[in-house]
Amino acid sequence: MASIMYTPKDIFEQEFKSSMRGYDKKEVDEFLDDIIKDYETYISTIEELRQENTRLKEEVKQAKKRQEAAQTTVSPAASVSSSRVATTATNFDILKRISRLEKEVFGKQITE
């Protein structure tokens, strides 16, 4: 990135050599005043953009931290959830087997 060669103060304090048929001093001064205003605008715009850039970088950093925290929270919950589903399925299978065994055992006793 190219650096700025002149500050508004440098432009304001610039002295030009005068010659017999030189430029109109008033016209040069007005032009330089316009350039100074432009430079001041550029400098303030650059500063605003730097501040916005810093703010946005901080927001991205915070968002990444929140995302990582959410991931660490979701991961254990997901594993607990999947283990509960497996446990529930296993318990259900056990209850079905017990029910069949009871029917076999107690069903025969009732008929006898």
Swiss-Prot record:
Keyword Nucleus: no
Subunit details: Forms polymers through the coiled coil domains. Interacts with PBP1, MreC and EzrA.
Superkingdom field: Bacteria
Compartments where located: Cytoplasm
Name of a matching Pfam family: DivIVA
Purpose of the protein: Divisome component that associates with the complex late in its assembly, after the Z-ring is formed, and is dependent on DivIC and PBP2B for its recruitment to the divisome. Together with EzrA, is a key component of the system that regulates PBP1 localization during cell cycle progression. Its main role could be the removal of PBP1 from the cell pole after pole maturation is completed. Also contributes to the recruitment of PBP1 to the division complex. Not essential for septum formation.
Coiled coil: 32-75
Biological-process GO terms, alphabetical: cell division; regulation of cell shape
Keywords: Cell cycle, Cell division, Cell shape, Coiled coil, Cytoplasm
Name of this protein: Cell cycle protein GpsB
Main location: cytoplasm
Gene3D superfamilies: 6.10.250.660
Family, per entry: Belongs to the GpsB family.
GO CC aspect terms: cytoplasm
Tagged with keyword Kinase: no
